[in-house]
Every structure is written in structure tokens, then in C-alpha cells.
Amino acid sequence: MASVVTKKSKKSGDTINAKLALTMKSGKYVLGYKSTLKTLRSGKAKLILIAGNCPPLRKSELEYYAMLSKANVHHYAGTNIDLGTACGKLFRVGVLAITDAGDSDILDA
């Protein structure tokens, strides 16, 4: 029974990765903590993705700004290395703000 649960969570992780890859190709996004905060303060961010190993203080600050700007927050299941790989980058990505999803339906998830 536990294997079914892990398969389901792995599948949802795969779908978020696929949607994220499509957003990277066709949408607009901002990588990094400082740039994400600027995007949140200007009200342009629609979705924030936070890596699982992001420090708690930084995570709570991002959630607070997202609440003020009415942006959705998604806590990515993997680490910042996994999030960077899912974005198609060769570096770590701790925080990511999506301003325009493009052809992807990641904002509906």
C-alpha cells in the first residue's frame, strides 16, 4: 500500500517538473531570492516555487510577501539542486517566481 502512495507522489512530482519545463521554454520567470522579492513587491508574480531545503526564515518571508501580493506558493518536494535540474539549469535554484506561464497550465495546479 505504501508503494502506491510513493508512486502517486512521484507522478505528481513528474507532472510539476513537466509543467515547469514547459514554463521555462514558453513563459516568463525570475530565479533567485532577491529577484523574487522584487517581483512580489511589484505585484507581477503569479506563482512562487520554494525548494524543500530553503531556510525557514527565508521561506516565511517569501510566504508573507506572497500573501500580500496574492500570489500562490508551491513548496517543491525536492531540494534546490532538484529544482535547478527541473528548471533545466546547471546550478541550484532555491526560489523561483513565475510571472507568465506561457503555454503551461502550472498556475492551475
Curated annotation (Swiss-Prot):
GO MF annotation list: pre-mRNA intronic binding; RNA binding; structural constituent of ribosome
GO annotation terms (biological process): cytoplasmic translation; negative regulation of gene expression; rRNA processing
Gene3D superfamilies: 3.30.1330.30
Keywords: Cytoplasm, Ribonucleoprotein, Ribosomal protein
Primary site of residence: cytoplasm
Cellular compartment(s): Cytoplasm
Record bears the keyword Cytoplasm: yes
One GO location term (cellular component): cytosolic large ribosomal subunit
Pfam families: Ribosomal_L7Ae
UniProt similarity note: Belongs to the eukaryotic ribosomal protein eL30 family.
Note: There are 2 genes for eL30 in S.pombe.
NCBIfam families xref list: PRK01018.1
Quaternary structure and partners: Component of the large ribosomal subunit (LSU). Mature yeast ribosomes consist of a small (40S) and a large (60S) subunit. The 40S small subunit contains 1 molecule of ribosomal RNA (18S rRNA) and at least 33 different proteins. The large 60S subunit contains 3 rRNA molecules (25S, 5.8S and 5S rRNA) and at least 46 different proteins.
Biological function: Component of the ribosome, a large ribonucleoprotein complex responsible for the synthesis of proteins in the cell. The small ribosomal subunit (SSU) binds messenger RNAs (mRNAs) and translates the encoded message by selecting cognate aminoacyl-transfer RNA (tRNA) molecules. The large subunit (LSU) contains the ribosomal catalytic site termed the peptidyl transferase center (PTC), which catalyzes the formation of peptide bonds, thereby polymerizing the amino acids delivered by tRNAs into a polypeptide chain.
PANTHER family referenced in this protein's UniProt entry, alphabetically: RIBOSOMAL PROTEIN L30
Identification of the protein by name: Large ribosomal subunit protein eL30A
Source taxonomy: Eukaryota, Fungi, Dikarya, Ascomycota, Taphrinomycotina
